[in-house]
């Protein structure tokens, strides 16, 4: 949870340093809009060094202008199992 009160769904830490490596937000919408990303953007203000991912039902992967990766859930899982993220 960010100091502002916003939160993200999943936080992945580096094993030994406890630095945040990934912040992941999960949305059930068909297309992620800016309003869906308030929490992850607030979290980024406190942890600017990590990767930001939003998983949703979007039709294809994309990246926002400010660097948040948006992945359709099925494509995210394929990439996850292939080792792309961790």
Regions found by a protein language model. Give the residues of each.
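A cross-kingdom feature that marks ATP-driven nucleic-acid transaction machinery
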Residues: 1-86
């Amino acid at each position: 949870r960010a100091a502002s009160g916003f939160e993200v769904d999943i936080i992945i830490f580096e094993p030994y340093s406890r630095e945040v490596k990934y912040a992941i937000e999960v949305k059930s919408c068909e297309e992620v809009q800016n309003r869906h990303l308030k929490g992850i953007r607030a979290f980024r203000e406190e942890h600017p060094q990590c990767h930001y991912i939003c998983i949703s039902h979007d039709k294809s992967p994309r990246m926002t202008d400010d660097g948040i990766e948006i992945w359709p859930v099925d494509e995210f899982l394929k990439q996850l199992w292939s080792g792309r993220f961790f």
